[in-house]
């Protein structure tokens, strides 16, 4: 079952609650941070980034127990 909401740190997609919410990687101050984020956003740049990340995430699906 999902346990994380948008903006919370996560390890894999299924932890994040919501049909369009994925566990994505962002960079904060040079450090990699995994957070639950929406696949779609109002920002076209983030959308393009998200599309690429989803393709990568789907290819190397992160699994967690």
Curated annotation (Swiss-Prot):
Main function: In vivo, intrathorax injection into crickets causes death.
Localization (cell): Secreted
Expressing tissues: Expressed by the venom gland.
PTM description: Contains 4 disulfide bonds.
Family the UniProt entry places it in: Belongs to the neurotoxin 25 family. F7 subfamily.
UniProt key word Secreted: yes
Keywords per UniProt: Disulfide bond, Neurotoxin, Secreted, Toxin
Highest taxon above the source species: Eukaryota
Protein name: U15-hexatoxin-Mg1b
Record GO cellular component, one term: extracellular region
MF terms (GO), sorted A to Z: toxin activity
